[in-house]
Structures are given as C-alpha cells and as structure tokens.
C-alpha cells in the first residue's frame, strides 16, 4: 500500500520528471560512447523543472502539507521601460508586484479626473461618492500647489531685496574705506526683515527667528510731518479772506442784541425810585413772499455781482484762444491765419493824428525857343515823400508856361495827374506855383494861376511806407 500512496501523493512535477525520464528511456540507446553524455543531460532537465516549480515555496512542504499553487504574477506593461534602462527611473512595476493591494500602476491624472468630474451624474452611489472624494483631493492638491508657488515667490523676492540692500550698503561703505583687512561681509544681512516669519511658521518651515536670538529693536511709530509754512495762511490773508459764515454769524448776534435792548424801556419814578418796565407792542414784520420766478431767490448784491463779472471776464480773457486755422480752408473768414502773428495791421510810423499835408512848388526857366519848368510835390503823411516832374512847352504858343505833377489819392491806390497853365504877363523867372493845399480838389495858388485843369487818372499801385 505504501508505494501506491506515495504515487498518489506525488506532485505533477514528479510525474513530469518521470514522464521525461521514460521518454528518454524509450528512445533507442546509442553506443557506449554516447551513453555517458545522456545521463548528465537528463539530470539537468529534471533540475530546471524542479527549480521552476520551487520558485515561490518549498516543494517538500507543499508535498507534505498539500498547499495549492500561487497564481502566476502579472507581467508589467509592455510600454513601460525597465529600471535597468538608462532612460528611466520608474519603479512602479516593483511596487505593483510587492504591494498588490495598496499600489496600482494606473494613476488617475489631471485629464482623467477632469473628465470624470465633468461627466458625473451616474445612478451608482458608490461612483458618486468616489467622484466627491476625487474632487476634494484635487482641490486640496491644487491649493497646496498654489501655497508652494506663493511661498517660493515670497522667498525669491525676499532674497532679491536682501541682495539689493546688501550691495547698496557695501557701495556706501567702500566710499570711505580703501581696502578691508578682513574679507568678511561688510554689512549685516537684512534677510530677516524682508521675509515674513509668520507665513513661514504657518507652513511649518524654518524661519529666521529659529536661528536669531537677539531681541527685535523697538521702533516708535513715525511722527506726522508738520504742515509746511507755505501752505499756512498769513496774517494779512486771514484778515482779508474771512469766511462769510463768520461775518453773518456776528451780524446776526449784533442785531439780536439790539432788538432785545429796544424791547425794554426803563423809567424811574422820582418819589418811589422804582424802575418800571413798559413793554412795547411788537410790530409784526411781514416776510417777503416767495417770488414766482425761483431763479431770483438767490440773487447777489450789486457789488458782489460786479466783482463776479469782473472775475469772469478776467478768466475768459486768460482762456481766450484764437481758432486753429489748420481746420479752416484759406478762403474762409477764420482760415489761413496764424496763431502768433496778430490779424490787425501794424501801426504806421509817425503821428497818426496829423492830417496829410501837401506842398507843391513849380519853377520855370527861359530857354531860346521854349520854356522849361520843374514841379516838386512834397507829401507829408507819416513820413516825407517827394515826387518830381519836368516838362517844356514852345514859346510861340499862346501859353507862356505850364506845370504838371502827380497827386496821391488817399481813397484808393491811384495817382492823379494834374497840370497848371499860366497866362501871359507873368515873369517866367518867378515861381509859377507855391501853395499848400490838396491838389486832388484842384486848389490854386495865391495869384499865380489863371486856372487849373484836372487831367486824367492812371491806375498805379502806390506803396506808402
């Protein structure tokens, strides 16, 4: 019975070993030279099968106690690189193999969690509870990431301020020191004043108070800067610009005292010397009714109104600007004008009040065969102007002499030509015409003319400087 029971207790591995041995034994034997090489090969085969079976336990115990075989281990993902590779340091497959119930290789990332939260609404209560926990975990994770970023930014800014202050203090100290004998930090660091210790302690980080034991210096609050003198009112300014409310209040108090004094009349009796008071009947003062036009309710007094108008005119005069000519074409009334050059004409040199004075002098000379003459026209209108004309007439004619000249017309840009004819019986060596008048109207001299004839008009542009 023992051999049968032993055969029943044999494991599949032993049966596999026996089957392999029988397979090798059933094959035809080779010569003696080859029989020696088959025996070690058969033992090697049986050893490899035995070691594969005993990978997770002892075969003797499993044979005696009858334990069941462990399920085969899952292989890692094919796309995951092995830790022996130089391109990765992932050990998740080791953790997944050792801690099967606590670790999974599939991690829920940001995209998967966002899609799960957005697509919630399932009827499964367990799934909804899982999504709630996932959402809370994601919120806590994001909050901690924000806190870490904020702390990192705060520490970076504190270090930058510390470096800037240290460099500034070092440059100021080197202005008076040629060379420092000891190469040490020349100034004390101000990092402890740039960082927030409460914030560091709140997030369980090392603060400057952990390694600085000296007490903080007591600094009083800064005092308020006094009011500068230029912003205070002077004595004359206070006297001149008194508030209107103060004046009205003083006037009302004065009027109230006068009314109270007038209400009582004190009389003295000569016999009893008793003062008696006689009350006067109060005269009811009718208040002015509200006018129909409410705009006249708050009217100003005449002096105040004049002052306001004067101030308004001064402000308008200061703020009056010419229209910008760049927005108007030159043919418009306000277009093409300059903002700097005034539009009015410049004043003429000389006296403007003086009236224009005309003076015409004519002289003649006898020449065989004819009589020559010369006319000098002097114009005084702001500045002296002299115009001259010469001419001659034959002596055989009935006219012994003739004069001609030019006159300026103030009414328009034209020059008037005129001539004077002298009769016989006048000495040709004497001046023909010496007169102060206006040649425009043909005024004659004192006895020198017989008549003056007006000739023709010639359009001529005349520039008066």
UniProtKB/Swiss-Prot annotation:
Q: Which residues cross the membrane?
A: none
GO terms for biological process, alphabetical: cell differentiation; defense response to tumor cell; negative regulation of cell population proliferation; spermatogenesis
Q: Which UniProt keywords apply?
A: Cytoplasm, Differentiation, Spermatogenesis, Tumor suppressor
Q: Would I find Chloroplast among this entry's keywords? A: no
What InterPro entries does this protein's entry cite? Answer: DLEC1 (IPR033304)
Record has Plastid as a keyword: no
Q: Its principal location?
A: cytoplasm
- Provide the residue span(s) of the region labelled Disordered: 1-38, 322-350
For bias kind Polar residues, which ranges apply? 11-38
GO CC list? cytoplasm
Q: What are the protein's GO molecular function terms?
A: alpha-tubulin binding; beta-tubulin binding
Give compartment(s).
Answer: Cytoplasm
Protein purpose: Essential for spermatogenesis and male fertility. May play an important role in sperm head and tail formation. May act as a tumor suppressor by inhibiting cell proliferation.
Q: How does it assemble?
A: Interacts with alpha-and beta-tubulin. Interacts with BBS2, BBS4, BBS5, MKKS, TCP1, CCT2, CCT3, CCT4, CCT5 and CCT7.
What is the name of this protein?
Deleted in lung and esophageal cancer protein 1 homolog
Q: Which organism is it from?
A: Rattus norvegicus
Q: Which gene encodes it?
A: Dlec1
